[in-house]
């Protein structure tokens, strides 16, 4: 299937289409494009607030619309339009959290591995694979030595939901490798991904913003503390990683965000990313997430 994309500040960001959740990151980036993140301090309360709110709005849509397009019509063009993003952006209160946002109406009618490879010519491979939830189903086909995946866990049992369980149907899928090119000449800007279930689109948005809006190199972008919205809803609890400035955490709480500060081994909830950035002269720069045992190297 062809990837889906949006333009973000001169870059073209590619994600996997539904039934994958890549559209979540693209919806959030469209919303965030209306805010001048580059002039905001790296961890200012204002910046963290709008990023969290954009992810909430994106998940509100994704949790409803992402399903198997062979079974349900998904308004892809409308969901990814700048006009729709503008309308959704108006729902963000700069002073208060929206804990339980509703999906929009765009039509007017846990055991994952990721790798990225880029060659000297700028050809790139962004690859991700997962059985889901550790060992998937835990069922090993006799004589084959691997476990079967359990992606059916992400079906809805609501008979009125587009992602409702049905024979021969693909469920909402979390794994989404990403690719970014420059709009001006279609040259490669970055090949990257962030493992971690429903953290993946959230990681994509935060890492890309750190690269483009923050001007950071891949390793520095991956090293930054992150936030993670609760996987079970578009709103609810927001996990905040240790290292986020105390003043920012306190300000977000005052805005109404229900925060949970996370440290130590529990930081696995924030995902594990890999990035290869290619500058305009063709020089490659890689980074690997310190939250896992990955590695950035050259051959």
Feature roles, as predicted:
Residues 1-18:
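Long, well-ordered, tryptophan-enriched scaffold segments
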Residues 14-22, 112-116, 126-139, 193-201:
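Glycine-rich phosphate/pyrophosphate-binding beta-alpha loops
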Residues 22-38, 180, 184-190, 197-222:
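M16/insulysin-pitrilysin zinc metalloprotease superfamily fold
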Residues 34-131, 143-144, 151, 263:
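Internal maturation/activation junctions in enzymes
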Residues 91, 95-98, 102, 110, ...:
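Cofactor-centric catalytic regions
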Residues 121, 169, 204, 213-267:
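Extended C-terminal subregions enriched in glycine
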Residues 123-186, 190, 200-201, 214, ...:
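Active-site rim segments in enzyme catalytic domains, especially the processed small/beta chain
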